[in-house]
Amino acid sequence: MAMRSAYVRRGISALFVLAIALCTGNAASAQSLDWEGQTGALITPFAYTAKSPAKGIGKPAVAFHYLSGGIILNDAYQASITVGFLGRVEAGYTRTIVSDANDTIYNHLFDEGFNTFHGKVNMIPENMGKTTWVPAISVGFVARTNEKRGGLALVNLLTVPNPYGTTETYDFYLVGTKTITQIKHLPILLSAGVKGTNASILGIVGAAPDWEARAFGAAGFVFTPGKQTLILGAEALQEPNQIAPKTGDAAIPGISIPTTLAYFARFVPSGVPLNFDLAVAQIAGCIEGPCTNGEGLNLHARSRIGIGISYRF
């Protein structure tokens, strides 16, 4: 456990050194990837896709994200790569690595990493038909594999031999995004969508007992001080209210998952294809009450810090 934490710390140091080195590269536009590797904010995708030519494959974008999950959810590290092609499609892969330096009763339910694959197709480009009001509209999916977290981990922990092993969770979504530029010196970014999902908190807490339609959205103000770009915004992501070992199983009694909120700042320096993200995520606190006198289950993840770095080659 200590050895894995040491490797993670070395990896973070190497990534920051790489980021500094990349700042000396050729100028280009930045590519902003979210927690799961999609073009987006922190926890929600935008309708935009990774940059690519209309008749070819674009250069890849890479990202690293870190979330201080607390004593229960543990620290999570995301390494992503995303590629755009045909001017309107993107696809990518993200690996989640977890550092379980804590040793509590519950944190071992959330100490396993997993894989995430995603794809997105832009159906309607922004400002189509030479208009100024048409949003970009896209459809996409997210597939998370090799998950052993939350309810599944609890069942495996209490039963020998493990009855399940791993599970998968998925999102299928429709999203619209518009950058409003009519307000002088203050562009506004608005994004909203709906998804069908069987995942709880992007798979961080595991699976939901059934598929549900959940809404999500983001809004941000774009500032351009001294040719730099600073985006300040907020996001909301509805969650399935319950969790289960696997989709189709009975819900674990007494659990209630709240809507996930995030407040983010994105800085894009002038002249380099790089951006930095800083966010505060309200994930979940007491999900099984009353969480007093040692009773209930408190995830202690109401105000968690996240950071991210994205770079496009």
Q: What residue ranges belong to the model's regions?
A:
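Detector for outer-membrane/organellar transmembrane beta-barrel domains
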Residues: 161-253, 259-260
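N-terminal secretory signal peptides that target proteins for export/translocation
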Residues: 1-9
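Outer-membrane beta-barrel "beta-signal"
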Residues: 116-123, 282, 297-313
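Residue-level signature of outer-membrane beta-barrel architecture
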Residues: 83-87, 121-123, 178-180, 221-223, ...
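Transmembrane beta-barrel strands of outer-membrane/channel proteins
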Residues: 62-68, 91-95, 137-145, 190-196, ...
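Transmembrane beta-barrel domains of Gram-negative outer membranes and organellar outer membranes
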Residues: 29-172, 177-182, 242, 248-251
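Bacterial N-terminal signal peptides
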Residues: 13-23
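Membrane-embedded beta-strands of outer-membrane beta-barrel proteins
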Residues: 79, 117-119, 174-176, 217-219, ...
